[in-house]
Every structure is written in structure tokens, then in C-alpha cells.
């Protein structure tokens, strides 16, 4: 078996040469990282969230360091669907034609999501939509779409009806029980899941006696959340039949294989990109060696082995 075949995985809409994907919000639209290495090396790219209209994000400060991680409250800053369709996605396709794009979609109400999902699949090389259901629903008192199984299912159904590409749903860990939500979005037609999104957290400045972030709360990411991600992925993998792209604290080839053991079929790398811009190609390069170390001949076989063990 060639090195390439060992790492390749097939998921709905995605034929990946390797399973490593920069996570949405940690890689922009690839422009900055393209100065460092050829993005065609990546399995895929989850681009920054797209909303119907431009978003300027939250007031600063909006990033804070934590032990083994970071808090962010960026607020989905992006130039909006029109600019992303006209400039950002075509640039990626022109410069990196072998890189499948996963478009992350966010909104404040169901109609916003539907409008973006109806169009973004037309952009060149967009193979999959990642639906960010952790956004507050302005029509339901600001409660996140992803915290209620019925609301999440209705959103998925509406977006699925207009989407031209497979739909993956990004699950929030900030819930009492993630399983009913995973089952609800699968029943509503989701083609895959991505998980986990950030955990909510806060930090205080001892001098000012106030929260460090202007938004007060932020999303916690980085190595600190990996055990939580593994636990939730493992839980969800027992009850759904659609593939999971695992994320949360991944920074090494060993972490990637742990995600597979939990039930993931591909892996996204987020916060680690800030500490080391080369982390994704380094993991891709190291993966075959670590697979050898643990007697893993291919990722597809590992996926099957994990699936068989849950029966």
C-alpha cells in the first residue's frame, strides 16, 4: 500500500488524500498560510465562517491566553457572502485547485443560513458546507440553534433543501446532552458531523477586577479541551451512522489517531496553527511513522476497526 493510500479517506462530498484539515476560524481563507507552504498538501480546508452580510465582530480585546489553550470572542468577523463568493473562494480555487473547500456557514436566524447555503455551493471547489449551529438565534431569545434538538433539526432540514453540496453540522459541546442533538440533525438529513466547537469560558484581570474579554465570555480551545472532545465524539459515534470530523485540541499525529479511536473519520486542527503555522504539514508527514508504531496499516481500515468494535 502506498503512503498516499494509507492516509486517504472518503467521506460524503470529500475524497481526501489525507485526513488533516485546518479548522474554521484558525486559518482565515488560507491567504496568510499560503505564504509558508503549498496548501495543496492539506486534505481539505475549513474556511472562516461566512454570513449573509459582513460582520465586524466583537469589540476588543477578544483573545485571551489560558493554561493549555486560549479564549476567543472574535464574533464571526467576515466580509460577507458576496465578497467571499467573488474574491476569497475563487482565489483559493485558482491557487490551490487540488484543495477541496469546506465552507463554514453561520447566521442569526434560519433565513440567513438558508440564503447562504443556497448560493455558496456554487463557488468553485466548495465540496461541503459546515453548518455552525452554535450561533445565537435572535428570534428565540438568543439561545444557540445547537442547544435544542428540534430547532437544530429544523435548521438542518431547511438548509439541506437548498444546498447543492453535502451538509455537515458542527455540534456545540455547551449542552446537557449532545446525543439527542446529534441524532436529531442526522434524522433531519445531515451528511456528516464536525465536533466539537469551543467550550464557553471566562477569565478575569486581577488589576481591573473585570473580565479580560470585552465580550465577557469566549470560546475555549486548545489542548485543554481534547479529553472533552474525545469523550463527546466517542459518545456520538456510538449512536450515529454518519461520519464525524473530529476536532478539539489536536496538535500531533498521536492526537489524530486518538480522534480516530474515538470514532472520527477525519480530523481538523485549530488553535495549534497559531502556535506553529506549519503544524498541519508536520502532522501529515509524521502520521505514517506513528501509524507504523501502533500497527495501523491504513486510516480506512482503522475507521472500520473502530466501527466494528462498537457493534
Curated annotation (Swiss-Prot):
CC annotations in GO: cytoplasm
Binding site for FMN: 24, 48-49, 104, 132, 170, 196, 222, 248-249, 270-271
Swiss-Prot/TrEMBL GO biological process terms: 'de novo' pyrimidine nucleobase biosynthetic process; 'de novo' UMP biosynthetic process
UniProt xrefs under CDD domains: DHOD_1B_like
PROSITE patterns: DHODEHASE_1, DHODEHASE_2
Pathway note: Pyrimidine metabolism; UMP biosynthesis via de novo pathway; orotate from (S)-dihydroorotate (NAD(+) route): step 1/1
Cofactor(s) in the UniProt record: FMN
Localization per Swiss-Prot or TrEMBL: Cytoplasm
Gene Ontology molecular-function annotations: dihydroorotate dehydrogenase (NAD+) activity
InterPro entries in the record: Aldolase_TIM, DHO_dehydrogenase, DHOD_1B, Dihydroorotate_DH_1, Dihydroorotate_DH_1_2, Dihydroorotate_DH_cat, Dihydroorotate_DH_CS, Dihydroorotate_DH_I
Keywords: Cytoplasm, Flavoprotein, FMN, NAD, Oxidoreductase, Pyrimidine biosynthesis
Annotated catalysed reactions: (S)-dihydroorotate + NAD(+) = orotate + NADH + H(+)
Catalytic residues (positions): 135
Residues involved in substrate binding: 48, 72-76, 132, 197-198
EC number: 1.3.1.14
Family: Belongs to the dihydroorotate dehydrogenase family. Type 1 subfamily.
Chain's role: Catalyzes the conversion of dihydroorotate to orotate with NAD(+) as electron acceptor.
NCBIfam families: PRK07259.1 (NF005574), pyrD_sub1_fam (TIGR01037)
Protein name: Dihydroorotate dehydrogenase B (NAD(+)), catalytic subunit
